[in-house]
Curated annotation (Swiss-Prot):
The light-harvesting antenna system in red algae and cyanobacteria is formed of phycobilisomes. These are composed of the phycobiliproteins phycoerythrin (CPE), phycocyanin (CPC) and allophycocyanin (APC). Cyanobacteria also contain phycoerythrocyanin (PCC). The phycobiliproteins all share the same subunit composition and organization with variations in the covalently bound open-chain tetrapyrrole chromophores. It comes from Galdieria sulphuraria. Belongs to the phycobiliprotein family. One of its GO terms (biological process) is photosynthesis. The gene is cpcA. This is C-phycocyanin alpha chain.
Length: 162
């Protein structure tokens, strides 16, 4: 899994050298941001249920047909609503994993790689998840560096969906 730290180490090792001062500074910067990233991951995790439920409601409000149309890809039944919440939760989990490792590796490997195919196969609209992620970003309650760190990965997911 790629992270800024593993990439710096891999580059140095491939060239048979020690880490350069620039690479060491990048690693140090990651460690300085790590506390804020872990704070964000903890907060998102402890508030996950509230954020997921609120994000699902935001999707139903912006796209009312999602809770009115019958079908496996819609939230017109309890099963459909549970699937919607599960999917939103998956995006939120990926954000927390990225926060913990300090890079987009988890999202790249476990989510983005097959995202377009999954959405097409199951007739899911990326705009639903963009709305959910925008809700989470606007309502996560984080501030300062913790918010910056979380928003970086939320924006990364939004851009992947756009």
């Amino acid at each position: 899994m790629k992270t800024p730290i593993t990439e710096a180490i891999a580059a140095a090792d491939n060239q048979g050298r020690f880490l350069s001062n620039t690479e060491l500074q990048a690693v140090n910067g990651r460690y300085q941001r790590a506390a804020a990233s872990l704070e964000a991951a903890r907060s998102l995790t402890s508030n996950a249920e509230r954020l997921i439920n609120g994000a699902a409601q935001a999707v139903y409000s912006k796209f009312p047909y999602t809770s009115q149309m019958p079908g496996p890809q819609y939230a017109s039944s309890a099963v459909g609503k549970a699937k919607c919440a599960r999917d939103i939760g998956y995006y939120l989990r990926m954000v927390t994993y990225c926060l913990v490792v300090g890079g987009t590796g988890p999202m790249d490997e476990y989510l983005i790689a097959g995202l377009e195919e999954i959405n097409r196969t199951f007739d899911l609209s990326p705009s639903w998840y963009v709305e959910a992620l925008n809700y989470i970003k606007a309502n996560h309650g984080l501030s300062g560096q913790a918010a910056n760190e979380a928003n970086t990965y939320i924006d990364y997911a939004i851009n992947a969906l756009s």
